[in-house]
From Swiss-Prot:
Alphabetized UniProt keyword annotations: ATP-binding, DNA-binding, Nucleotide-binding, Phosphoprotein, Transcription, Transcription regulation
Lineage: superkingdom: Bacteria
Ligand binding (ATP): 214-221, 277-286
Pathway(s) of this molecule: Nitrogen metabolism; nitric oxide reduction
InterPro entries hit by this protein: AAA+_ATPase (IPR003593), GAF (IPR003018), GAF-like_dom_sf (IPR029016), Homeodomain-like_sf (IPR009057), NorR (IPR023944), P-loop_NTPase (IPR027417), Sigma_54_int (IPR002078), Sigma_54_int_dom_ATP-bd_1 (IPR025662)
Protein name: Anaerobic nitric oxide reductase transcription regulator NorR
4-aspartylphosphate, modified sites: 56
PANTHER family: ANAEROBIC NITRIC OXIDE REDUCTASE TRANSCRIPTION REGULATOR NORR, TRANSCRIPTIONAL REGULATORY PROTEIN
Species for this entry: Aeromonas hydrophila subsp. hydrophila (strain ATCC 7966 / DSM 30187 / BCRC 13018 / CCUG 14551 / JCM 1027 / KCTC 2358 / NCIMB 9240 / NCTC 8049)
DNA-binding region: 483-502
């Protein structure tokens, strides 16, 4: 029996929170104490999936997992119920938290209650309450659970309302521009990520050019996508060009286009990236690799808004916002005469620093959970868990390759764990990660790279998969994540490489 005083104390306690996150944690800790549960979670509903906002009694990596309704029938049942849902211990619907409770990783959840949370009859989230005893919540009535759900819905709705008001001035006019469940997203609750999100919100709805600075593998392309998604140009194209992968002979044509007969092989007119991005955004990745002659031509387009296709004297007007990214120190490149000072100042109107993973180690459990869930889906697994000791190993590692290195490490570990354990619910252990050697530096030749030793006890197919995965990862790292260059280095057709990477779980 839940007393009115207990509910009143929860309501008053929520007023003491200094931030949304603090209030959410107070809420679920109070719920766990009030209902004597083993675990509880507050989740937000968005884009066909539940996103954990706060957890108690669950492993930290749960905060990074995403529970798409189409992949999690129990979550779908909660979303569609419209009221309290009690799942019996013998429910045929798998519990998404099985194996994700500390000290209970070998046990299944036996008592589960789901409370869908609504605002004006619209689903905004859910509160899940779990226990290891099948009769743990039998003495609590549905009406009492509804009262708890009402408190949770009010707290979540207030947070969402304040979030909408705070973003109102910079929200894009175009509906449906948030990332869906299939799109990668920026994961993290650290102060560094909070600062990054704030900077994106500040600049997104302006027309300023943005220079994204950061090491390889930090997610500069995700930042560019977030800026574009929050802009008034969100409905127009976001066109991507990797300047580092451009041979000098075709770079000008890629940027500005050409007309038929302009040079040998120009058999038809071709629009360049600037034309394709007209009225939208052009993301120039690794801008520091452009040659000085091309920098001069790029500067002219930025200054006057017109360009000429190769072989054509007719100027074309374009309206393009530039987002550029680099892992180089462009200020030093200017001093050394490798980058034009006037172009640098044009591009760096609003610089954004993408934090390295070592600057936000507290986000590693969330990222690990996020990649585990994506890997689970790509490999067709029922569950994919990571041991606490393995998670601690990941948190201690320096990650010179940043988020990309972490993602590849988890995918490789998942392939090894699946082969080693022969299970649809494998657990990633410390020995599945080989982190001592670190990633290859960009200058290392993939053909000469030492391969990471494989664990014993693997069958031929599993060992072959693990070897192929490790070789692709190392070659990809050596070519700065460029798939076309990786395919050439491995002497593979690009399409075959992408299909192999998907089968191995390296790509979603």
């Amino acid at each position: 029996m839940i007393s009115t005083d207990s509910l009143a104390r929860i309501a008053l306690d929520l007023q003491l929170g200094i931030s949304h996150q603090d209030r959410f944690h107070r809420l679920i800790q109070s719920v766990r104490s009030l209902l004597n549960s083993d675990a509880s979670a507050l989740l937000r509903y968005e884009g066909g999936q539940f996103i954990p906002l706060a957890i108690d009694g669950l492993m930290q990596d749960v905060l990074g997992r995403r529970f798409a309704l189409k992949d999690h029938p129990r979550m779908e049942a909660i979303a569609r119920a419209g009221d309290v849902v009690r799942f019996p211990a013998d429910s045929s619907l798998p519990d998404p938290y099985d194996g994700l409770l500390p000290d209970h990783d070998d046990f299944k959840v036996h008592a589960c209650v789901g409370l869908p949370l609504f605002s004006d009859q619209a689903l905004i989230g859910a509160l899940t309450i779990d226990g290891m005893n099948p009769t743990q919540f039998d003495a609590i009535s549905d009406e009492e659970l509804r009262l708890v759900g009402a408190l949770a819905a009010a707290a979540l709705n207030n947070a969402l309302l304040l979030e909408r008001l705070a973003r109102q001035s910079s929200e894009p006019l175009v509906p449906g521009t948030r990332p869906g469940p299939e799109q990668p997203e920026m994961i993290g609750q650290s102060p560094a990520m909070a600062r990054l999100r704030h900077e994106i919100e500040v600049v997104a709805n302006s027309e300023l050019n943005v220079l994204i600075l950061g090491e390889t593998g930090v997610g500069k392309e995700l930042i560019a996508k977030a800026v574009h998604r929050g802009s008034q140009r969100a409905k127009a194209p976001l066109v991507y060009l990797n300047c580092a992968a451009l041979p000098e002979s075709v770079a000008e044509s890629e940027l500005f286009g050409h007309v038929k007969g302009a040079f040998t092989g120009a058999i038809h007119n071709r629009a360049g990236k600037f034309e394709l991005a007209d009225q939208g955004t052009l993301f120039l990745d690794e801008i520091g690799e452009l040659s000085l002659p091309l920098q001069a031509k790029l500067l002219r387009v930025l200054q006057y808004g017109d360009l000429q296709r190769i072989g054509d004297d007719t100027p074309l007007k374009v309206n393009v916002r530039i987002l550029a990214a680099t892992n180089r120190d462009l200020k030093q490149a200017v001093v050394e005469g490798q980058f034009r000072a006037d172009l640098y100042h044009r591009l760096s109107v609003f610089p954004i620093h993408a934090p390295a993973l070592r600057e936000r180690p507290g986000d590693i459990p969330l990222l690990a959970g996020y990649f585990c869930e994506r890997c689970r889906l790509s490999l067709g697994l029922e569950q994919l868990r990571i041991q606490p000791q393995a998670l601690q190993l990941l948190e201690r590692h320096d990650w010179p390759g940043n988020v990309r290195e972490l993602e590849h490490a988890i995918h490789r570990a998942a392939v090894l764990a699946r082969a080693e354990q022969g299970s649809q619910t494998p657990t990633l252990a410390s020995h599945h990660f080989n982190l001592a050697a670190g990633p290859l530096p960009p200058s290392t030749s993939p053909a000469m790279a030492p391969m990471t030793p494989l664990p014993g006890g693997l069958g031929l197919r599993a060992a072959t998969d693990a070897f192929q995965l490790a070789l692709i990862e190392q070659t990809l790292a050596a070519h700065n994540g460029n798939w076309a260059a990786t395919a050439r280095a491995l002497e593979l057709d690009s399409g075959n490489l992408h299909r192999l990477a998907k089968r191995l779980g390296l790509k979603a």
